[in-house]
Amino acid sequence: MNEKYAALKSNVSMLGHLLGNTIRDAHGEELLAKVETIRKLSKTARAGSDEDRNALIEEIKSLPDDQLTPVARAFSQFLNLTNMAEQYHTISRHCEAHVCEPDAISTLFSKLSQSNVSKLDTAQAVRELNIELVLTAHPTEIARRTMINKLVKINECLSKLELGDISFSERDKTERRLEQLIAQAWHSDVIRQERPTPLDEAKWGFAVVENSLWQGIPEFLREFDQRLEGHLGEGLPIDARPVHMSSWMGGDRDGNPFVTHKITREVMLLSRWKAADLYLKDINELISELSMVKCTDEVRELAGDQHEPYRAILKQLRTLLGDTLESLDAQMKGELVPNKAILTDADQLWNPLYACYQSLHACGMGIIADGSLLDTLRRVKAFGAHLVRLDIRQESTRHSDVLSELTRYLGIGDYDQWSEQDKISFLVNELSSKRPLLPRKWEPSPEVQEVIDTCRVVAEQSKEALGSYVISMARTASDVLAVHLLLQEAGCPFRMDVCPLFETLDDLNRSKEVMEQLFSIDWYRGFIQNHQMVMIGYSDSAKDAGVMSAGWAQYSAMEALVEVCEKESIELTLFHGRGGTIGRGGAPAHAALLSQPPKSLKGGLRVTEQGEMIRFKLGLPEVAVNSFNLYASAILEANLLPPPEPKQEWRDLMEVLSEVSCEAYRNVVRGEKDFVPYFRAATPELELGKLPLGSRPAKRNPNGGVESLRAIPWIFSWSQNRLVLPAWLGAGEAIQYSIDKGHQELLEEMCREWPFFSTRLGMLEMVYTKCNPQMSEYYDQRLTDKSLWPLGERLRNQLQTDIKAVLNVENNDHLMERDPWGSESIRLRNIYVDPLNMLQAELLFRTRQQEETSPELEEALMVTIAGIAAGMRNTG
């Protein structure tokens, strides 16, 4: 890397050297020499030497089976360490300004002052600030929890080594510790031997909260409070809750038969247990700190005649939390539950802790109150008694199946065969009725019983424990009403947000019409109390129509939903189902939020954070603080300095781009007769299905083709062979078409003046930079029948044409010109990803020759898949 990134370069070099020592100790000098030869050949091949590229291919082809796994692990492990060094660099004191965006909030406040935004308006926007991140297990973090814990400790060592005044012995000790951690990682199994259960995934989510967010959220709020104090003259109210967490882990049953109502109940108990456990650690720390004697009458009343009143109150809370852990333990084990008071509501913690806080301030000890006690109070608001709120997600047809079976049993016809109007009439009638609908003697099928039992589990919980009920593949108003009816029948005592997820191109285009129909129903308007959540699906719409067309459909749907809710005086929260990759809506958070339609963030931000992106954005407390800063500044900016309304000619051209790109995408994916055989042969799609990643099957329908593949394995497969097809196909072709039609000037204007369009092009540039056409060609030659080669060649030629079109519109000479750090980061990884790709192609070739794949080859293949995912940084 160039000298600009000297500190990062130094850390990468040190970690690489320590990894080399570990490899030598474990496998001998010969294997280390082999790894080093491959690395050097990869570097010179990347610099343009065809001779060295051929030598690299031959070197990898000649590896005996017993060397494949250690060589693959060497490069995979190095990429993990590089990611760690890079993540650390973004929070280190040596980080360059254009890399870190160290103080997004202060930058925003300067911008607001220059734009004459009043402090009153800013204060109001801060009061309304609402960031809800929803942790999800898919595409499933490739790295195991074991590895992640080691990487967190490696980060701590890097932090120590950065201190200027570190003593020689301390440096030596820290470097030794680093080497131990790298050796531990090397000798641990990098790949799970069995698929994680939904319970394992939920525990992974809780580990993220414990290791990072428990510290990161109060730290962010402390910094945010200081910035507000400086800019507005008033800080953040103590009870403010601008950030909170939800989760799909253990609640998302869409296409995952392993998430049952029993699992959901267990995950919710576990979530409460983990919350009580973390609060108990906080309370024990506060007991050791708050030894003060002076207090207000209110605290004296709570503490009784104890000499140390604060400790007395905290000890009461310690008992409450201890009893809570005991009770939840018994419930999870199915044992007799002790009859003791336990934590069920956050106010049980908040009220006594807040009384202590006010008392300390009143008695002149504000500096003490504003320390650990304030952090705990912030946590109580952010995490509640349940740590994370659990969403329930289910596919729309599972609800209509319940009603269909029920109506047939009742002898009133088949719900599924009714018209939409008849369904709505029936549902509204039943929702307004005071008598129960489910007959006592009815014995439904197991699938239907499971849906009913899930609704009953929801009804058992407190409202605070739950997020929203998300209906995937929502298409009609009756899909939403059906869930409300099933929850009512289950005895749900509170109003739960029922959130339709519009995810295909057609469904996005119809979303406004569906919501208008719902808002026209009196029962519905009365029930929702002027609040509506709608989820925008990014992954399936992109898989259905390509990224350009899907992006415009998402934008148009958001705009239409904002308009209809404004007209009806309904507060709208848009829930974004983004992933880590562009093919699933992934973009740098700040840019993505500022490219949304005006007013679309008025109701706050609710967004999924997926598997591996959770680690990159939230995996360390300091990194989480940076991420929250970016989210908060982007939402405030979008609401206080909204982006321009798109001009009509921009909209018209976007319609053309959308239509042309969708047609170009579908002509290949649906219209090309060789496409499916090519996809199956040129990518590890079939092998990926066997990888023990997430708890969820790779296909919605195990017998279906590409169309039944989930969006995640679809994108994951293409990113493995470096063609990354779903993330660009159709977009550049549409841009070139518009240039040919004489619209270049208009495209350039859109690029300059419209954040939505410039962000699209920026995302495309990043994808193009990650593509490696030469590598894709190597996969073709090694793995596909010669009859399929012309299709691969056509796609790669299209990619080159598309890159020229995008650079032309942006007036750039090369990709990522405006993002040198991003470009450098990808370039650094390529040297290590390329050998993994060649290894993977070789392994796929060897395993496909065998009737029964040897465990040796299967393990090596899994390591390459995990390594390439680490190198590409966003798996799916």
Curated annotation (Swiss-Prot):
Listed GO CC annotations: cytosol
EC top class, as a word: lyase
Protein keywords: Carbon dioxide fixation, Lyase, Magnesium
Cofactors (names): Mg(2+)
Reaction(s) this enzyme catalyzes, per UniProt: oxaloacetate + phosphate = phosphoenolpyruvate + hydrogencarbonate
GO BP term (any one): tricarboxylic acid cycle
Record's keyword annotation contains Lyase: yes
EC number per UniProt: 4.1.1.31
InterPro entries cross-referenced by the UniProt entry: PEP_COase, PEP_COase_bac/pln-type, PEP_COase_Lys_AS, PEPCASE_His_AS, Pyrv/PenolPyrv_kinase-like_dom
GO molecular function: magnesium ion binding; phosphoenolpyruvate carboxylase activity
Signal peptide residue numbers: none
Catalytic residues (positions): 138, 543
Domain of life of the native organism: Bacteria
Similarity annotation: Belongs to the PEPCase type 1 family.
General function of this protein: Forms oxaloacetate, a four-carbon dicarboxylic acid source for the tricarboxylic acid cycle.
Record HAMAP family: PEPcase_type1
Protein name: Phosphoenolpyruvate carboxylase
